[in-house]
Amino acid sequence: MTVREGLLHFVLLGILVLLFFVVSDYHDGNWARIMVLAVYAVGYNLLFGYTGLLSLGHALFFATGMYGLALPIQHLGFAPVPAFLSALVCAAVVSSAVGFLALRTSGVAFMIVTLMFAQAGFLLSLYAGRYTRGDEGFVIPQSARIIAGIDFSDPTIRYFAAFFVFAAAYLL
């Protein structure tokens, strides 16, 4: 990375910090969501940009992490930190299994295999609607949004948590 590119990265991050103080609360929430999805895009860029493998099933891993966090909280009564660890384990297991099979292919076959796994995950979440609430989803209880005394339902905390995760992913 050149000095100019590095400077551009930090200017973008500076703009994101300033946006919090300029735009309304509604838009702060939208920007927080955008930064979370940008982390998703950075992961996709790592795969496609460095390996040339075009994955059509990248959302499966995003959903696995989300359900790996939310389901233990909702149905098993996990505290937030063990649920977060559960999400990491679930995402690692699913991505390892899919990667083990998908990386034996390349080109269009890789795209088809990753799409197949993503569709299987999507259908699983729909058919297990009793637990996942299908395409409606569910809301994590307020008590589970407090980690180490920090309330992540607070818009300011949520914005800057999304910002720091995005900044870490973006700068790496």
Where are these regions (language model features)?
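Transmembrane alpha-helices and adjacent helix-loop boundaries
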Residues: 1-172
